[in-house]
Each structure stands twice: as C-alpha cells, then as structure tokens.
Swiss-Prot record:
<dbReference type="GO" id="GO:0005654">
    <property type="term" value="C:nucleoplasm"/>
</dbReference>
<feature type="zinc finger region" description="THAP-type">
    <location>
        <begin position="5"/>
        <end position="57"/>
    </location>
</feature>
<dbReference type="GO" id="GO:0005634">
    <property type="term" value="C:nucleus"/>
</dbReference>
<dbReference type="GO" id="GO:0006357">
    <property type="term" value="P:regulation of transcription by RNA polymerase II"/>
</dbReference>
<comment type="similarity">
    <text>Belongs to the THAP1 family.</text>
</comment>
<keyword id="KW-0863">Zinc-finger</keyword>
<protein>
    <recommendedName>
        <fullName>THAP domain-containing protein 1 A</fullName>
    </recommendedName>
</protein>
<dbReference type="GO" id="GO:0043565">
    <property type="term" value="F:sequence-specific DNA binding"/>
</dbReference>
<dbReference type="Pfam" id="PF05485">
    <property type="entry name" value="THAP"/>
</dbReference>
<comment type="function">
    <text>DNA-binding transcription regulator that regulates endothelial cell proliferation and G1/S cell-cycle progression. Specifically binds the 5'-[AT]NTNN[GT]GGCA[AGT]-3' core DNA sequence and acts by modulating expression of pRB-E2F cell-cycle target genes.</text>
</comment>
<dbReference type="GO" id="GO:0008270">
    <property type="term" value="F:zinc ion binding"/>
</dbReference>
<dbReference type="GO" id="GO:0000978">
    <property type="term" value="F:RNA polymerase II cis-regulatory region sequence-specific DNA binding"/>
</dbReference>
<dbReference type="InterPro" id="IPR038441">
    <property type="entry name" value="THAP_Znf_sf"/>
</dbReference>
<keyword id="KW-0131">Cell cycle</keyword>
<dbReference type="InterPro" id="IPR026516">
    <property type="entry name" value="THAP1/10"/>
</dbReference>
<feature type="coiled-coil region">
    <location>
        <begin position="139"/>
        <end position="194"/>
    </location>
</feature>
<keyword id="KW-0238">DNA-binding</keyword>
Amino acid sequence: MVQSCSAYGCKNRYDKDKPISFHKFPLKRPLLCKKWEAAVRRAEFKPTKYSSICSDHFSADCFKRECNNKLLKDNAVPTIFAHMEIKKKSGKAVKKEQLPAEPEPVPAVPEIDPAIGLLLPPLYTPSHIAVICDHNYTVEDTVHQRRRIQQLEEQVDKLRKKLKIANQKCRRQERSLEKLEREVSEYREAKGSGYVIFPGNYYEVLNENEYKELTPEITYKEIIL
C-alpha cells in the first residue's frame, strides 16, 4: 500500500526519488494525536495505523538534526497547510473587493451668476452637510460656555460689591469705637482733676450750692465739684 498524506488538499505520495518523508499519527499518545487531528481539520476524520502526514506540513524545528531531518521530535505537531493559507489570502481578497471605495470629497467651487455678477453660495454634498451639522453643535456649545462665563462674572461683581459695603461698615464701626475710646479717656482725665464737662443749654452749673442757668452761647462749662 502506497503511503499518502492525510492532510486536506495534499496530494503527496511516497516516492523514493523525492525528499519527502511520511510520519504516522502518534496513536499511542492520545493527547498528541488529538493535536495532529485538530491540525488536519478534516471533519469526522479518525486516523488509523496506516494514516500519515508528509514532512511538508512540519516546520524545520520539528525534526531532529542528527537524523538528517527524517525523524520528528517527541512533541512535533504539523502546522503548515497550504489550503489554510489559500483560504486566508482568498478571504482577505474577497473582503477588499467587497468593500467599495470611498469617494474622495470634492471641494465646492463657488459659481458666478452672470446676471448679477456675484458669487453664488456653493452647493453642499451630504458629507459637507454632516460636517456643517457637527460644526453647529460645536458653536452651540461655545455659546453656552460664553453665557455661563458671563453669569459667573456677574456673580463675582455682586460679591465684590457686597464685600466693599461690608468693609465700609467695618471702617465706620472702627471709627465709632475709636471715638468712644477717646471720650472715655477724656472723661477719666477730667474726673481725675476734679472737673466734669457738661453740654451747654441743657444743664445747670452747681457752684457753692447755688444753681445758675447757662446762656445759649456757652457750649461747655466746667464745674468745680
């Protein structure tokens, strides 16, 4: 019985004049044999003791160099299959052919109306319209941001005015406090010397147990206690 390759689409047969070797499925090693079966990718394929795969489906590192590349290593698995490469290439070609070429956008050229001698607005294609719509969204966002910035600036101005008014109130209160402190200090000095200052036109001066009315022209009088 002439040995032939069990790989799908491979027509290699044993020929002593060709440098092709054939390798039996490792039936005694089930795990490795399953890998060979999966690599062959043949539906409902069950290898027998006569099934083999030719050396064309093994990479160079799968062979033992000391045996002139005739014996496989213990963990060698076939990985080279021409039909798989053809399918990949054909699949890529079909995908490229199926994809229609995108038309290049043609810039709109303004036309001149011969009747009035003015430039007419350019005609927009659907792609131009899509771009314009996107630009409108951007413009709306920009307008919204400007309004928001304007509102924030107005709030800042209001807060500055409130802060200014509060500072003015604080300064007035400080001046009032300083005035009261001066009056208290003057009162203490006057009390220490035996004199008391009263406003004119409202009080009478006590002098040697006798009351006398103050004239309207007198603003302040000193009384000896």
